[in-house]
């Protein structure tokens, strides 16, 4: 039986293709983040099925316009349930969006055209419609836990059509 040849990727040779997640420097690791801020949205888990539901409610530290944390360096101290992504947990966190750079690299997949490491432009994540910019309706300080169910949305778990393109639209 003949082995199926490995598909050649135009990204072969880049650090995320040549290093394991554990071998990456801190700067390389951080650069895998595309800046979408979808992971900073509040999520609910169905206790029976384990299914994750995203909301359009942001963490109290999320700047929804910049798609960045107001206090990234101290986020874990200020938000005790903030999940720090690590090489170990990105392989098992089921709620990471399908577009997440950490998830894609952990799965051995290529980054999308709009990822800043590919495009060279941190704004392409917004241009592609992947980020939360303009979609965060409130922060967790404005919505009670009991009311989060009323804020469930499906878009964070989906990839926008233009983000699926092979290259930046014309």
UniProtKB/Swiss-Prot annotation:
InterPro entries according to UniProt: Puta_zinc/iron-chelating_dom (IPR005358), UCP006173 (IPR008228)
Pfam families tied to this protein: CxxCxxCC
UniProt cross-references to PANTHER family, sorted A to Z: UPF0260 PROTEIN YCGN
Similarity field: Belongs to the UPF0260 family.
NCBIfam families: PRK05170.1-5 (NF003501), PRK05170.2-5 (NF003507)
Name this protein carries in UniProt: UPF0260 protein RPB_3505
Organism: Rhodopseudomonas palustris (strain HaA2)
Classification of source organism: Bacteria, Pseudomonadati, Pseudomonadota, Alphaproteobacteria, Hyphomicrobiales
């Amino acid at each position: 039986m003949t082995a199926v040849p490995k598909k050649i990727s135009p990204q072969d040779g880049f650090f995320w293709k040549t290093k394991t997640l554990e071998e990456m420097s801190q700067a390389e690791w951080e650069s895998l983040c595309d800046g979408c801020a979808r992971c900073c949205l509040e999520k609910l888990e169905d206790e029976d099925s384990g299914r994750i539901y995203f909301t359009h409610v942001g963490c109290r530290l999320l700047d929804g316009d910049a798609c960045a944390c107001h206090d990234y360096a101290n986020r874990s101290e200020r938000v005790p349930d903030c999940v720090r992504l690590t090489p170990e947990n990105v392989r098992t966190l089921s709620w990471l969006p399908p577009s997440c750079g950490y998830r894609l690299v952990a799965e051995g997949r290529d980054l999308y055209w709009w990822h800043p490491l590919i495009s060279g432009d941190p704004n392409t994540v917004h241009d592609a419609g992947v980020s939360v910019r303009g979609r965060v309706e409130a922060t967790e300080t404005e919505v009670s836990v009991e009311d989060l169910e009323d804020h469930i949305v499906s878009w964070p778990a989906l990839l926008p059509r233009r983000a699926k393109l092979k290259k930046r639209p014309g």
